[in-house]
Amino acid sequence: MNSDQVTLVGQVFESYVSEYHKNDILLILKERDEDAHYPVVVNAMTLFETNMEIGEYFNMFPSEVLTIFDSALRRSALTILQSLSQPEAVSMKQNLHARISGLPVCPELVREHIPKTKDVGHFLSVTGTVIRTSLVKVLEFERDYMCNKCKHVFVIKADFEQYYTFCRPSSCPSLESCDSSKFTCLSGLSSSPTRCRDYQEIKIQEQVQRLSVGSIPRSMKVILEDDLVDSCKSGDDLTIYGIVMQRWKPFQQDVRCEVEIVLKANYIQVNNEQSSGIIMDEEVQKEFEDFWEYYKSDPFAGRNVILASLCPQVFGMYLVKLAVAMVLAGGIQRTDATGTRVRGESHLLLVGDPGTGKSQFLKYAAKITPRSVLTTGIGSTSAGLTVTAVKDSGEWNLEAGALVLADAGLCCIDEFNSLKEHDRTSIHEAMEQQTISVAKAGLVCKLNTRTTILAATNPKGQYDPQESVSVNIALGSPLLSRFDLILVLLDTKNEDWDRIISSFILENKGYPSKSEKLWSMEKMKTYFCLIRNLQPTLSDVGNQVLLRYYQMQRQSDCRNAARTTIRLLESLIRLAEAHARLMFRDTVTLEDAITVVSVMESSMQGGALLGGVNALHTSFPENPGEQYQRQCELILEKLELQSLLSEELRRLERLQNQSVHQSQPRVLEVETTPGSLRNGPGEESNFRTSSQQEINYSTHIFSPGGSPEGSPVLDPPPHLEPNRSTSRKHSAQHKNNRDDSLDWFDFMATHQSEPKNTVVVSPHPKTSGENMASKISNSTSQGKEKSEPGQRSKVDIGLLPSPGETGVPWRADNVESNKKKRLALDSEAAVSADKPDSVLTHHVPRNLQKLCKERAQKLCRNSTRVPAQCTVPSHPQSTPVHSPDRMLDSPKRKRPKSLAQVEEPAIENVKPPGSPVAKLAKFTFKQKSKLIHSFEDHSHVSPGATKIAVHSPKISQRRTRRDAALPVKRPGKLTSTPGNQISSQPQGETKEVSQQPPEKHGPREKVMCAPEKRIIQPELELGNETGCAHLTCEGDKKEEVSGSNKSGKVHACTLARLANFCFTPPSESKSKSPPPERKNRGERGPSSPPTTTAPMRVSKRKSFQLRGSTEKLIVSKESLFTLPELGDEAFDCDWDEEMRKKS
């Protein structure tokens, strides 16, 4: 730079400082220490806006311009000092430094990664984490030398590029042409303090969370001088503004010169207390305030929205997500009167079998936390977790480990049990005292580790519930007692759970979609950063519950002495504060205390009241408010706090009454998910607004019932409104009959997947099994598309599936046909809404199902004819048998209940009865069939073996679904219905039974008395509407079936039930006689039912079947790999007993 440029830059900067930083300079002038170094922080954006020319010079010559800035700053300070009226109170300071910050955000000036060689000489902003700090040194930056010949005295500055070494000139720099090369250092053995400055080197590393997988974080040294020394410590996140420079050792002969890139810092900004680039303005806060205002009447539903957005790729696991969210929210750190610091961070340990999603939670938590470190136990040592002493350039320095780097953040440790024994003890202090004391290589210090530890581990071998957690995972009690929560995830090998998880994974793989209801990762990160600023205080009611629970834990006979100490009470307080933060509150209420006690009871650290829980199969509740009410009743009764219970129940009742009419418009618009559709027959669907219902259907997150939550928005018809009170009455009666079991988390195995058997009583005359069998099969052809199990059909609601919906791929050619179906169904629904009917449903406890099944089988063997009640009307059409939806019921463990529900009559075609019982005993199985592809017309039905539907009054419907969906060790054939449901059905066995009087039979059953064909009975119902099923028969040639549909809308369970049965045509013989009895049941041969046809109105469809080698296969164009929805009862089968029966 020439003199004119230097003058211009100095004048502009001096005027800028005098205008914008006059107050800062006045404060500096009032300081008493004249030798100290004082910074003046200047915003680069404001400076460059004042004069763009300065910005150009600054980018081209940063070192020279910074020196000019310091000189201009001293002149400006002198000018301000002279302008003061009372200069006695101030003094001039010579060590003033201009610190540049706030560079324009562009890739040329702001870097998140370590600079490279091309950046040398540029002024940059670099973000990183401090991993090493050296000792503060004294640096002599200039010396005086005198020429021995001419006695000329000159000053030599230390060369930064050569590690601040002094390089003597080759000749005397005097103007008298002295060519002497001998000089004498005037400084001698001691240096003047004015010629020395503080000097420190730190080492920064790229932030791990900003790196891609497999990238090794790079590091570089940063030079700190003057006032920047000791401005940071190991583990701090920094934004450093400085000049990228290179330096090398002095040259030596025959030694390669090693050049090192360093950053000479001009200004350091510590980001520990900031949100790492997350903007927290009023608009963002207002957005979250509006969110909670929307869920003011049901705050737990709003909380579940957040929980469902936490790690959405993992299905269910409601309890684990709640615990992780509470740990991420964190408690409040306190310092008592004696100076002892009580930690506010909670620690969580996930213990589970392989494949239970532990690592997924750790990875997601590390992503949404600004300061996080993810490591594994097998790859970590005590030094790697705490602090390391390293020797560099002949001196020892301390290098921070994972816990120090995660200070004020999150440290995730996977495979926690892989830590060596002596390494585990090293983190005891870091977990409880939140500090690490080091005495290594003569360096004694204490570093902060105010971090939350989220660890995951596998049990040692098979988890034994009879043993303690310490024995199962081989970790010591002192270490386990430092974890606030220990959740156990046991893989119980539940077939229903396996089916749901596999369907969830496969559906997401095939049809990935982005939800509009779930929160994005950026929104989650912003929310958790925002709530950590809240400081909730404990209320008296919350204190009372936590204190009473702590006392109960201490008095428990099976208590863990190492756990039930004062640490338990502190853990309860921390978790209660964390839940209050999660709920966006500044007070810890009774709701927070009840939730914390319930979570603690479900962990291995609790269990004094109700026992531990397997957290793997916990699911999102259908109604969070009702779940909380059950928690209150159970916990407060156990804690003997009846006054709080009665007061809380009154508060909940008032809140519910206030929100009834306020939420009515919103309730009608909310979509019903499979969780809320689990009602009895004819009962209206519960239109609730829980988070699982409002968001999970958008992203196809499956409910524990196994159905994708993707139903379109459905407005209930007007005739459903009067039945809401009835539903609430039954809900209250059901709640009064509950036992004190820990089922508020709606376990997969009990709450959502244990359907009860029911008995249906119809007021209409009973028809024979054959008539009932022949009148219902035609309804299976009422649409090309079937909904998945537990999900409403697209034909039912008159809407097309979205491209992101799972189970049914997008087909543009279905648009027109579906529109017509929607109009027809809506008009028919309005007509059928006025037809009254009544059905009584009785739910049988699970422990009676086996007994009922045995009695039903015994009665079936003794039966020789159709009961007399099954009379055939003289007219060709009769009322249908109403079949309530078992799979969509909402059963509770060991709680029988009865619901009165309404259905409408329908008219059907019937056929003469037969004698199915004798045929069942004579029937045999057929060989496994082969797969043949055919593109014939939709209504083509290939010839194949026939099946007989036998009248059996007490055959359990649980066996029906089990045998229909699980062809284990049974020859049969596989049939794919238009709903893409693949079901395997053994030939010759009956899976449908007709209605029987409830006074004789406990479980609900249906008998199909069809002697010559295998037919199923669908249910066409929505609310109080029922449909008229139509006759469908199968022949050995193409048949066209049509009929008039009187139904309103098809129930989701109807389609799931249709998928469980096969449509098989009669054999070519067409013999109407019953099949002859075979001596060897191992022989296989088809029976010969007659071929019949019936009219059909709706469009034709294709089917997918596995048949014999001579049979043709008709394949649907739709997805073929969606499994039917089955309840737990479908899997309760003793296959050894079944095989013995067959043999």
UniProtKB/Swiss-Prot annotation:
Q: SMART domains in the record, alphabetically?
A: AAA, MCM
List membrane-spanning regions. Answer: none
InterPro entries with a match to the protein in the record: AAA+_ATPase (IPR003593), MCM (IPR031327), MCM_dom (IPR001208), MCM_lid (IPR041562), MCM_OB (IPR033762), NA-bd_OB-fold (IPR012340), P-loop_NTPase (IPR027417)
Q: Outcome of mutating K358A, per the record?
A: Loss of helicase activity and DNA mismatch repair function but does not affect the interaction with MCM8, MSH2 or chromatin
**Alphabetized GO MF terms:** ATP binding; ATP hydrolysis activity; chromatin binding; DNA helicase activity; enzyme binding; MutLbeta complex binding; MutSalpha complex binding; MutSbeta complex binding
> Which Pfam families does this one have?
MCM, MCM_lid, MCM_OB
Q: What class of enzyme is it?
A: hydrolase
* Gene3D superfamilies assigned: Nucleic acid-binding proteins, P-loop containing nucleotide triphosphate hydrolases
Give start-end of the signal peptide. Answer: none
Q: Where found?
A: Nucleus; Chromosome
Q: Which GO terms describe its biological process?
A: DNA damage response; double-strand break repair via homologous recombination; female gamete generation; mismatch repair involved in maintenance of fidelity involved in DNA-dependent DNA replication; protein localization to chromatin; recombinational interstrand cross-link repair
Q: What are the boundaries of the region Disordered?
A: 656-738, 755-815, 868-916, 942-1011, 1063-1105
Q: Which GO terms describe its cellular component?
A: chromosome; MCM complex; MCM8-MCM9 complex; nucleus
The protein's annotated catalytic reaction(s) are: ATP + H2O = ADP + phosphate + H(+)
SUPFAM superfamilies for the chain: Nucleic acid-binding proteins, P-loop containing nucleoside triphosphate hydrolases
Question: Could you tell me which CDD domains the record lists for this protein?
Answer: MCM9
What EC number(s) would the UniProt record show?
A: 3.6.4.12
- Primary localisation category: nucleus
**Domain MCM, chain residue ranges per copy:** 300-505
Question: Which residues are reported to carry the modification Phosphoserine?
Answer: S762, S802, S1109
Could you list this entry's UniProt keywords, alphabetically sorted: ATP-binding, Chromosome, DNA damage, DNA repair, DNA-binding, Helicase, Hydrolase, Nucleotide-binding, Nucleus, Phosphoprotein
Q: Which family does it belong to?
A: Belongs to the MCM family.
Q: Which disease is it linked to?
A: Ovarian dysgenesis 4: A form of ovarian dysgenesis, a disorder characterized by lack of spontaneous pubertal development, primary amenorrhea, uterine hypoplasia, and hypergonadotropic hypogonadism as a result of streak gonads. ODG4 is an autosomal recessive condition.
The record describes its quaternary structure and partners as: Component of the MCM8-MCM9 complex, which forms a hexamer composed of MCM8 and MCM9. Interacts with the DNA mismatch repair (MMR) complex composed at least of MSH2, MSH3, MSH6, PMS1 and MLH1. Interacts with MLH1; the interaction recruits MLH1 to chromatin. Interacts with MSH2; the interaction recruits MCM9 to chromatin. Interacts with MSH6. Interacts with the MRN complex composed of MRE11, RAD50 and NBN/NBS1; the interaction recruits the MRN complex to DNA damage sites. Interacts with RAD51; the interaction recruits RAD51 to DNA damage sites.
Name of this chain's protein: DNA helicase MCM9
Gene this protein is translated from: MCM9
